[in-house]
UniProtKB/Swiss-Prot annotation:
Protein's name in the database: Homoserine O-succinyltransferase
Keyword annotations from UniProtKB, A to Z: Acyltransferase, Amino-acid biosynthesis, Cytoplasm, Methionine biosynthesis, Transferase
Pfam families named among the record's database cross-references: HTS
Pathway: Amino-acid biosynthesis; L-methionine biosynthesis via de novo pathway; O-succinyl-L-homoserine from L-homoserine: step 1/1
Entry keyword Metal-binding: no
Active site annotation, chain numbering: 142 (acyl-thioester intermediate), 235 (proton acceptor), 237
Ligand binding (substrate): 163, 192, 249
Organism of derivation: Shewanella sp. (strain W3-18-1)
Catalytic activity field: L-homoserine + succinyl-CoA = O-succinyl-L-homoserine + CoA
Any one cellular-component term (Gene Ontology): cytoplasm
The protein's role, per its UniProt record: Transfers a succinyl group from succinyl-CoA to L-homoserine, forming succinyl-L-homoserine.
Length: 318
């Protein structure tokens, strides 16, 4: 089923060329289908690239998805035109009165800055707090996952001496969660960050559970026990070239970055990059949208109290 996006959004042409089913708002208005309403808070510098990556995953699910794009209202985007932002993005004041089936909060290039020192931290906290009452399920990616664990559960992160960049093997640590349905016992996922959360700190928290982790990259999938918040420590949305682009950007800035691990053939940055994570990245978002959004969200979004209790759904999910 299609992902519904604003007319003329630049990502549309890219996705259509990849045979991803997208639908304009005009066309979707003529269909009598209750789409899943998903809000995306895009904190990444290249807004259009990130939009395309996330819409690619949402467009590969069997559900019709109606997407709104959200920005921090007083933060200027240095890498995306103001015309694009004003045309396709909403401010929080435009949506705070609404309810959504899902919210995705992206990563951000803020890995070495204390959360409290992030200039728009108060806005992030406000949106996270709002989401707990107005959204069925929240998907936090990379930096946002760390920020969410810190704000909601009081867990802090450790700053790494070197950026963790590359594609790492992960293993399932739980066997019977719908989120992991169809996953192999081991799978790949990309990481690009300057910090990490301690796996044992997460395990010891009574409201959290670790569903997948890596010996090299640590915790990857963390789910709150009320099934409302999913924290993904990596970047399942990344396209094949993203780590390469980041590596060469850092080289150009004189940062002397490490070569992304397990990414280039024979770990040679002059060789071809190999994408090993796309199938599981797609499956992750599809399972989240199906089992943790679609099957739990109320038909009438104005009444979030009508959300189906998770316990009653487990009996029907083998």
């Amino acid at each position: 089923m299609p992902v519904r996006i604003p007319d003329h959004l630049p990502a549309a042409g890219v996705l259509e060329s990849e045979n991803i089913f997208v639908m304009s708002e005009t066309r979707a208005a003529n269909q009598d289908i209750r789409p899943m309403k998903v809000l995306i808070l895009n904190l990444m510098p290249n807004k259009i690239e990130t939009e395309t990556q996330l819409l690619r995953l949402l467009g590969n699910t069997p559900l019709q998805v109606d997407v709104d794009l959200l920005r921090i209202h007083d933060k200027e985007s240095k890498h995306t035109s103001i015309d694009h932002m004003n045309t396709f993005y909403r401010d929080f004041e435009d949506v705070r009165h609404k309810n959504y089936d899902g919210l995705i909060i992206t990563g951000a290039p803020l890995g070495q800055i204390d959360f409290e020192d992030v200039v728009y931290w108060d806005h992030i906290r406000e949106i996270i707090d709002w989401s707990q009452e107005h959204v069925t399920s929240v998907l936090f990616l990379c930096w946002a996952a760390h920020a969410g664990l810190y704000h909601l559960y009081g867990l802090n992160r450790k700053i790494l001496q070197q950026k963790r960049s590359g594609v790492f093997v992960h293993r399932r640590t739980c066997q019977h969660f719908p989120l992991l349905r169809g996953f192999d016992d081991e799978f790949f996922a990309p990481h690009s960050r300057f910090a990490e959360m301690d796996v044992e700190d997460i395990r010891q928290h009574p409201q959290l559970q670790v569903l997948a982790q890596s010996d090299e990259a640590g915790a990857y999938l963390v789910l709150s026990r009320n099934n409302r918040n999913l924290f993904v420590m990596g970047h399942p949305e990344y396209q094949k070239s993203t780590l390469n682009d980041e590596y060469h950007r850092d080289l150009a800035q004189g940062l002397n970055p490490n070569v992304p691990q397990n990414y280039y053939r024979n770990n040679d940055p002059e060789a071809e990059a190999i994408a090993r994570w796309h199938s599981h990245g797609s499956l992750l978002v599809s399972n989240w949208l199906n089992y943790y959004v679609y099957q739990l969200t109320p038909y009438d979004l104005s009444d979030m109290t009508a959300m189906t209790p998770w316990e009653s759904r487990q009996e029907t999910l083998p």
